[in-house]
């Protein structure tokens, strides 16, 4: 079984980070890797940022001058990843999440911010592993199925509203 080291940082002040969210995100990363049969130690970096910052990154890397909910920056290609020279863990990539967008989407979809962050984490780790949905079609269907499978394993299917009490 893969062991995921998840490095989480907060570089925004607009939205309070919910209690327990870091543990939930680590569980999400671990669940994706487990579901995908990933067997080696791996590292993922996740950073919470503002709408302004994610808009700038979206413009720079995707030529879309608008805020988005999440961006994934895979460090591997075709299942080949560099290793952390100190730990030997595979470096999967970096994820940035707009907390403002996540909060808006949680409200729009009628579930908790925790559930939205869990979804965005699962979605993004799948991107780091090579899944895509941009062109639609069967790739999009397959990615959505993987998301729902992982979230269901975590008890966070679409009708669930995770609240850490």
State each model region's role.
Residues 1-118, 126-165:
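An acidic/histidine-cluster motif and surrounding catalytic segment
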């Amino acid at each position: 079984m893969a062991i995921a080291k998840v490095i989480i940082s907060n570089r925004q002040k607009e939205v309070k980070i919910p209690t327990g969210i870091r543990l939930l995100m680590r569980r999400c990363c671990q669940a994706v890797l487990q579901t995908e049969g990933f067997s080696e130690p791996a590292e993922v970096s996740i950073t919470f940022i503002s709408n302004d910052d994610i808009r700038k990154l979206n413009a720079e890397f995707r030529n879309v001058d608008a805020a988005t909910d999440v961006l994934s920056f895979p460090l591997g290609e075709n299942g080949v990843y560099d290793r952390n020279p100190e730990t030997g863990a595979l470096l999967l990539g970096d994820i940035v999440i707009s907390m403002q967008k996540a909060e808006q989407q949680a409200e729009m979809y009628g579930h908790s911010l925790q559930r939205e962050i869990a979804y965005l984490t699962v979605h993004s780790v799948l991107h780091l592993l090579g899944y895509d949905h941009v062109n639609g079609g069967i790739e999009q269907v397959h990615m959505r199925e993987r998301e729902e499978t992982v979230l269901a394993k975590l008890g966070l299917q679409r009708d669930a509203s995770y609240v850490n009490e």
